[in-house]
């Protein structure tokens, strides 16, 4: 494991215990995100975040290659601020046996995350993509990174420059919780 590309940074939103990240320059960029505890839920936003700033429209994809331990959710996030709260859009795998692929979004001031469910039998490795076109965010999933299936879209007011990256939601405070995300692409 080595130094990650300088455009990427690691941050923690809210209360995160034992968060750390490692990078390897293989499989088009591979991040291993580890955490003892950092949970996202209704009104709660505590998550480790590997991110970079992006201005304007984009297409961001990665593959969730491995999940170990008490990981309730992992995947992609686009967020207007690194602080808790604020508008955010996610495309993640998790919940209910760690097999639900779903788009999520939260609106500043609300204590609720909204969800649109994709495939309810998604297994790793799984590919996810978030696309921004103006004020609309689109979410997709794939089994091979080539053939993409539309999950949902939502209109979300965010600044032109936002934070885009990879997240994990970890529970129970145990060691050895991690996710491996690779084949990272931003256009």
Language-model region placement:
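Extracellular glycan-recognition regions
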Residues: 1-187
């Amino acid at each position: 494991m080595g130094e990650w590309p300088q455009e990427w940074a690691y941050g923690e939103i809210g209360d995160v215990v034992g968060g750390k990240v490692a990078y390897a320059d293989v499989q088009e960029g591979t991040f291993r995100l580890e955490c003892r505890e950092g949970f996202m839920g209704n009104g709660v936003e505590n998550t480790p975040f590997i991110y970079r700033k992006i201005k304007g429209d984009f297409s961001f994809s990665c593959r969730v290659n491995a999940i170990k331990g008490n990981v309730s959710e992992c995947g992609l996030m686009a967020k207007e601020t690194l602080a808790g709260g604020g508008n955010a859009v996610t495309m993640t795998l998790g919940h209910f046996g760690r097999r639900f692929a779903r788009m999520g979004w939260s609106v500043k001031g609300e204590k609720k995350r909204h969800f649109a469910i994709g495939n309810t039998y998604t297994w790793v490795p799984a590919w996810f993509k978030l696309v921004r076109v103006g004020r609309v965010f689109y979410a997709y999933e794939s089994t091979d990174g080539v053939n993409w299936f539309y999950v949902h879209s939502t209109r979300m007011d965010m600044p032109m420059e936002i934070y885009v990256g990879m997240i994990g939601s970890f529970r129970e405070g145990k060691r050895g919780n991690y996710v491996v995300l690779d084949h990272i692409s931003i256009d």
